[in-house]
Every structure is written in C-alpha cells, then in structure tokens.
C-alpha cells in the first residue's frame, strides 16, 4: 500500500505529528497569553485596517495563526483577496 501512496503522491501526517503541532500551538498561545477571543479581535482589527487600503479583502476568510519558526515564533495572517475586474487604485 505504501508503494501506491508513494506513486500517487498521497502523504498524510501521522497522528503523532498532528499532536505535536497542536501541543506547540498551545504552548505558543500560552507563552503570549492570547485567548481565542483576543485572536478573534486581532483578526477583526487587521481586517478593518487592511480594508482601508485593499477593499477587495475577504474578511470572513482571514486566518491568523501563531507558529514556531526556526529562529522566531511567527504570527501569520493569510488574507485572501477577492478578484475584481478593477485594477489597483491610486490613493
């Protein structure tokens, strides 16, 4: 079966790896004392500020995450933009 998975490129994270990632997330959240409510407020604040410059932001789809990088902990914001027929505005 692993031959078929290798052949078709299907790679799944082990449950141990998932558990490790979840634990790291909990530890990072605890280190910075960020509650789920604070993360939600940060997401809303980011959306509000970014919409001033990019009206095409899809605020409902913004994802804010904390993760551990090689040298630093990382705060990542994935901000999807709706595609529009208009070009960039000149403000």
Swiss-Prot record:
<comment type="function">
    <text>Prevents the cell division inhibition by proteins MinC and MinD at internal division sites while permitting inhibition at polar sites. This ensures cell division at the proper site by restricting the formation of a division septum at the midpoint of the long axis of the cell.</text>
</comment>
<dbReference type="GO" id="GO:0032955">
    <property type="term" value="P:regulation of division septum assembly"/>
</dbReference>
<dbReference type="InterPro" id="IPR036707">
    <property type="entry name" value="MinE_sf"/>
</dbReference>
<dbReference type="Pfam" id="PF03776">
    <property type="entry name" value="MinE"/>
</dbReference>
<keyword id="KW-0131">Cell cycle</keyword>
<dbReference type="InterPro" id="IPR005527">
    <property type="entry name" value="MinE"/>
</dbReference>
<dbReference type="GO" id="GO:0051301">
    <property type="term" value="P:cell division"/>
</dbReference>
<protein>
    <recommendedName>
        <fullName>Cell division topological specificity factor</fullName>
    </recommendedName>
</protein>
<comment type="similarity">
    <text>Belongs to the MinE family.</text>
</comment>
<keyword id="KW-0132">Cell division</keyword>
């Amino acid at each position: 079966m692993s031959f078929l998975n290798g052949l078709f490129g299907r790679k799944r994270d082990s449950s141990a790896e998932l558990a490790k990632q979840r634990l790291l997330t909990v530890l990072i959240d605890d280190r910075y004392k960020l509650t789920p409510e604070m993360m939600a407020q940060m997401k809303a604040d980011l959306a509000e500020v970014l919409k001033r410059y990019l009206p095409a932001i899809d605020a409902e789809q913004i994802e804010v995450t904390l993760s551990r990088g090689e040298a630093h902990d990382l705060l990542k914001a994935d901000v999807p933009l709706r595609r529009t027929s208009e070009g960039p505005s000149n403000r």
